[in-house]
């Protein structure tokens, strides 16, 4: 076995992921360090995307509460919040032709968007990255965090970035470059929904032992440039019903009018769906043919496409936030408010709360004689708190906890009671009075899938026309997804026989359909032989396979840094 020598770099804080949570944490730490005369406190952010914002995908309507706190003068400082919400409409699609708008008073207050902004979260994150660099945060795009490093006592020591130049055979190629070790007093994990290192930490430290199972959806999004005559900047539309109602599946859709004659539209399909024949990508394509949606897109042009799992378990599914040497923030923990269909402001606030706790712990350690820019290198030293319990305390006293507590029943009600009764329950809970009990949803999403014998209904998905509706491969093309071809697959099978031997006869191998990028195929090799093929280069890093595989046989790990989608203005 080859021993690889790695360069190690020391920081006070290492943050994994340059999204809204990670960058808000970095900014808050550096703001406090400068304000309190600790200007040498060092913060490093590693980002697997080719640039900050490359992997960011969201609706998005931003509630500005957190950014107001982080940058009170954000407007003067040029934050790209340029389109205030001007109209707020909610619809139920009754069929492929009919729709009904809900009166505003019937919509849960959590879904009202007064004072919010239609944004590109990718562009907001790029702006946050610039502000972080102005505060001397070190940001390393194109470096994927591949492994967690531990001290001998089990405390998290930092992370190792992925090696570059490993061939498909697992051996170093001529351009091999070893990954770096990044050591820190505290390591914050902000990888987004279903982060692969966050998943390991939750398992290692049993962080979810007192929580409900986490729940997810798959969000599929397109960006269109439309006829200026049809463009209504600030119009926000949400809805549910057809076509998901045909398979008894839950989820919803959005269409937002942004700036520059662009609309962002998409669908979230709850990954608790039961019918193995359901095809989330094609459900979204079919939805666009409804007259309510089609009217805006006709004569327009699709600019970009993307997909990403979203975390929706809320407060009931929130794991323990801290462990020795680090914390989970943002959607790595699961702070999205499903009742609002928003997670950007909650991710930012979680990062800010954690940033405050980190700074205070480091400042206390320095007061005791600890050094800056040197990780916790002495085993058992007590100059710096091993576990940041103050982060949890700050969360418990925050508006973030209050907001998530208020919304804790929203998802379980929809899952337990269905669209109509669940919707009525949520209207009462959110608009009239707070119910004095908590609902729980204890079934993991992957286990909800029925066998193909139990679910005989197969939806009809027309062939895409290439103008309004599209196939997956042409969609991946406009996501600008690129991977180094000569590298090991980052989609790992625990047992390579399961897709054909188990999943195919039981569920018609649902990976063929739940993947929004066409990564998984069943190839007929003749004479009754079938093969499971993984087209890893197509992967848009949505993590759906890691979540929904009914045999829990697929594990997503990070490919080479810089690979994956390159989302513009998404």
UniProtKB/Swiss-Prot annotation:
Keyword field: 4Fe-4S, Electron transport, FAD, Flavoprotein, Iron, Iron-sulfur, Metal-binding, Oxidoreductase, Transport, Ubiquinone
UniProt keyword Chloroplast present: no
Q: Which GO terms describe its molecular function?
A: 4 iron, 4 sulfur cluster binding; electron-transferring-flavoprotein dehydrogenase activity; metal ion binding
Q: Which Gene3D superfamilies match?
A: 3.30.70.20, 3.30.9.90, FAD/NAD(P)-binding domain
Cofactor: how bound: Binds 1 [4Fe-4S] cluster.
Q: Which residues bind [4Fe-4S] cluster?
A: 515, 539, 542, 545
EC number(s) reported in the record: 1.5.5.1
Instruction: Give all residue intervals belonging to the 4Fe-4S ferredoxin-type domain.
Output: 530-559
Which SUPFAM superfamilies does its entry note?
4Fe-4S ferredoxins, FAD-linked reductases, C-terminal domain, FAD/NAD(P)-binding domain
Q: Which cofactor does it need?
A: [4Fe-4S] cluster; FAD
Uppermost EC category? oxidoreductase
Summarize where FAD binds, as residue positions. Answer: 13-27
Q: Which domain of life is it from?
A: Bacteria
**What's its catalytic activity?**
a ubiquinone + reduced [electron-transfer flavoprotein] = a ubiquinol + oxidized [electron-transfer flavoprotein] + H(+)
Residues annotated as coiled-coil are none
Keyword Chaperone in annotation: no
Q: What does this protein do?
A: Accepts electrons from ETF and reduces ubiquinone.
Q: What is this protein called?
A: Probable electron transfer flavoprotein-ubiquinone oxidoreductase
Which species is the source of this protein? Answer: Acinetobacter baylyi (strain ATCC 33305 / BD413 / ADP1)
Q: Upper taxonomic classification of the species? A: Bacteria, Pseudomonadati, Pseudomonadota, Gammaproteobacteria, Moraxellales
Encoding gene per record:
etfD
């Amino acid at each position: 076995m080859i021993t690889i020598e790695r360069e190690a770099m020391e920081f006070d804080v290492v943050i994994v992921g340059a999204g809204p949570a990670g960058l808000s944490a970095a900014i808050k730490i550096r703001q406090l360090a400068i304000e309190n005369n600790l200007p040498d406190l060092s913060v490093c952010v590693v980002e697997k995307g080719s640039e900050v914002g490359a992997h960011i995908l969201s609706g998005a309507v931003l509630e500005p509460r957190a950014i107001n706190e982080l940058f009170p003068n954000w407007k003067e400082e040029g934050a790209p919040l340029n389109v205030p919400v001007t109209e707020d409409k909610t619809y139920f699609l009754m069929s492929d032709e009919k729709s009904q708008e809900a009166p505003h008073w019937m919509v849960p207050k959590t879904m009202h968007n007064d004072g919010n902004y239609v944004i590109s979260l990718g562009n907001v994150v790029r702006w946050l990255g610039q502000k972080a660099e102005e505060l001397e945060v070190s940001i390393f795009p194109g470096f994927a965090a591949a492994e967690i490093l531990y001290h001998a006592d089990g405390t998290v020591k930092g992370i190792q970035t992925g090696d570059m130049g490993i061939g498909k055979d697992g051996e170093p190629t001529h351009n091999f470059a070893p990954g770096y070790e990044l050591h820190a007093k505290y390591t914050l994990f902000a990888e987004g929904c279903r982060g692969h290192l966050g998943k390991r930490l939750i398992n290692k430290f049993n962080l979810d032992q007192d929580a409900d199972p986490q729940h997810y959806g798959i969000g599929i999004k397109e960006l269109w440039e439309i006829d200026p005559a049809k463009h209504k900047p600030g119009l926000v539309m949400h809805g549910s019903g057809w076509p998901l109602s045909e398979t008894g599946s839950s989820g919803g859709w959005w269409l937002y009018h942004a700036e520059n004659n662009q609309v962002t539209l998409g669908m979230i399909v709850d990954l608790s769906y039961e019918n193995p024949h359901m095809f989330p990508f094609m459900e979204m394509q079919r939805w666009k043919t409804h007259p309510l949606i089609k009217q805006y897109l006709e004569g327009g042009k699709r600019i970009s496409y993307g997909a990403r799992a979203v975390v929706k378990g809320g407060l009931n599914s929130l794991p323990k936030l801290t462990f020795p040497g680090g914390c989970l923030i943002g959607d790595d923990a699961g702070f999205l408010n499903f009742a609002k269909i928003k997670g950007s402001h909650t991710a930012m606030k979680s990062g800010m709360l954690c940033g405050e706790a980190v700074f205070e712990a480091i400042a206390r350690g320095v007061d005791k004689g600890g050094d800056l820019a040197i990780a916790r290198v002495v085993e058992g030293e007590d100059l710096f708190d091993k576990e940041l319990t103050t982060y949890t305390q700050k969360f418990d006293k925050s508006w973030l906890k209050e907001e998530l507590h208020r919304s804790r029943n929203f998802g379980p009600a929809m899952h337990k009671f269905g669209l109509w009764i669940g919707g009525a329950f949520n209207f009462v809970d959110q608009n009239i009075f707070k119910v004095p009990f908590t609902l729980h949803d204890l079934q993991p999403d992957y286990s909800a899938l029925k066998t193909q014998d139990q679910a005989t209904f197969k939806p009809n998905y027309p062939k895409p026309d290439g103008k309004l509706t599209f196939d997956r491969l042409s969609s991946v093309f406009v996501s600008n997804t690129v991977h180094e071809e000569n590298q090991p697959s980052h989609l790992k099978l625990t047992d390579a026989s399961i897709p054909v031997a188990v999943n195919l006869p039981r569920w018609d191998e649902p990976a063929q359909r739940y993947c929004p990028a066409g990564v998984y195929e069943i190839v007929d090799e003749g004479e009754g032989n079938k093969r499971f093929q993984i087209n890893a280069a197509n992967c848009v890093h949505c993590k759906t396979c890691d979540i929904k595989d009914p045999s829990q046989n697929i594990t997503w790990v990070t490919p080479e840094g810089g690979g994956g989608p390159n989302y513009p203005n998404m």
